[in-house]
Amino acid sequence: MKDSVIRKLEGLLERNEEVLALLSDAGIIADQERFRALSKEYSQLEDVVKAFKSFQQAEEDLESAKEMMEEDDAELKEMAQEEYKAAKETIETLESELQILLLPKDPNDDNNCFIEIRAGAGGDEAAIFAGDLFRMYSKYAESNRWQIEVMNTNEGEHGGFKEVIAKISGEGVYGKLKFESGGHRVQRVPETESQGRVHTSACTVIVLPEIPEAEAIEINKADLKVDTFRASGAGGQHVNKTDSAIRITHIPTGIVVECQDQRSQHKNRAQAMSVLSARIQAVEDEKRRSEEDSTRRNLVSSGDRSERIRTYNFPQGRVSEHRINLTLYRLGEFMEGDIDVVIEPLIQETQADMLAALGEG
């Protein structure tokens, strides 16, 4: 491993010890905000420090094995050769692991997120598929012990949703789900299709990180148009008799957010403002990214909403992830929330892309 990388890792190890000492300081414990920030930093350093300590131990084991190999005893020599080989393999594995752990982190990866699913081309079938996608993400959230909270729904006439917005809360939510942004296409025979013909329809998924209040962009109240209206209850849902639903328009950007799934206007307004803040931040981030990436495009996109990223083919039981040319014949399990089979390769591809870019640099 390069000396510059070793020096960086030694600096992180030192910082980890500093943070640990600070966390037991009475003054820090009394200052909740500072304590929270240091706890978060300690947690972020944990994996890289653990891997580096294992790396240092493996290097010591390698040196010990080298010395033992100089012994005259044949049995001891053979044992030393085995230890040398094992230590060398451990070092190689940990070098790769540490390279990935040192890659620049997306500061939003640990945040909660908002997921917006909208039916596109395909009418009723697109709305039904939007409902299927929402169920898939709900199952995935459940398997990760994340909390999911519906914020707004616009139901389809024959089931599913024309639009659904939900907040997903938990550890590392945005880092996992951000790659779901884009166009999702479905090919299947609708239940109403008597000829058995396969129809194609589409949905758009947008995943935005929740922006903590302290980091949120300041929104000028004069830039907002706020409308209240009566929530449209469906089927077995309650129908509000008061104007508790909220529609907020951010005039400078034209972004419109509606929230009506809470019974109180106050709660709907608070939720609408947090979604609005996330959307405005996303517009700003996109602007900055396009300036930074004008010379280079990432292999894996995590934000191009117009790009078709995945096809779900029901007659063939196939899911195709177009960004990394991955095809899997396990659509049933996938729709039940087993989506790590695609998310993990997408994360790995992104890491490989970043490592290649660092190599070029």
From Swiss-Prot:
**InterPro entries per the UniProt record, alphabetical:** PCRF, Pep_chain_release_fac_I, Pep_chain_release_fac_I_sf, Prokaryotic/Mito_RF, RF-1
Q: Which GO terms describe its molecular function?
A: translation release factor activity, codon specific
Q: Where in the cell is it found?
A: Cytoplasm
Query: What range does the record give for the signal peptide?
Result: none
Output the Gene Ontology cellular-component terms: cytoplasm
Q: Which key words tag this protein in UniProt?
A: Cytoplasm, Methylation, Protein biosynthesis
> Do you know which Pfam families this protein is assigned to?
PCRF, RF-1
- Principal localization reads cytoplasm
The answer to keyword Protein biosynthesis applying to this record is yes
PTM annotation: Methylated by PrmC. Methylation increases the termination efficiency of RF1.
Annotated region (Disordered), positions in chain: 284-305
Comp. bias intervals (Basic and acidic residues): 284-296
Describe the function of this protein: Peptide chain release factor 1 directs the termination of translation in response to the peptide chain termination codons UAG and UAA.
Family note? Belongs to the prokaryotic/mitochondrial release factor family.
Which PANTHER family does the record cross-reference, listed alphabetically? LD18447P
NCBIfam families from the entry? Answer: prfA (TIGR00019), PRK00591.1 (NF001859)
| Entry protein name | Peptide chain release factor 1
Native species? Shewanella piezotolerans (strain WP3 / JCM 13877)
Q: Gene encoding this polypeptide? A: prfA
